[in-house]
């Protein structure tokens, strides 16, 4: 199963770390997007996942999506995807 995260901040990082540590999903099966380059680089370094700046790429490649953006960005993000 390919898992996609829109947003790779603290909430997403905790979820990713837990599922990878438990062996539920391998890092290679996770893709995450973040508008901030620093966020993408941190997720790639800490979790070994594929990262992108493109939310649409995540929606196209993932079977399951996790929306992990701040509440004030929900409407904008949902409209985009």
What do the predicted segments below correspond to?
Residues 50-81:
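Rossmann-fold NAD(P) dinucleotide-binding segment
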Residues 1-46, 50-53, 57:
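NAD(P)+-binding Rossmann beta1-loop-alpha1 motif at the extreme N-terminus of oxidoreductases
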């Amino acid at each position: 199963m390919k898992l996609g995260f829109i947003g790779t901040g603290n909430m997403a990082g905790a979820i990713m770390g837990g599922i990878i540590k438990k062996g539920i999903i391998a890092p290679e099966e996770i893709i995450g997007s973040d508008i901030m380059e620093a966020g993408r680089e941190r997720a790639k370094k800490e979790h070994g996942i594929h990262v992108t700046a493109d939310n649409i790429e995540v929606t196209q490649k993932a079977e399951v999506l996790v929306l992990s953006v701040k509440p004030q960005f929900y409407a904008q993000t949902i409209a985009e995807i």
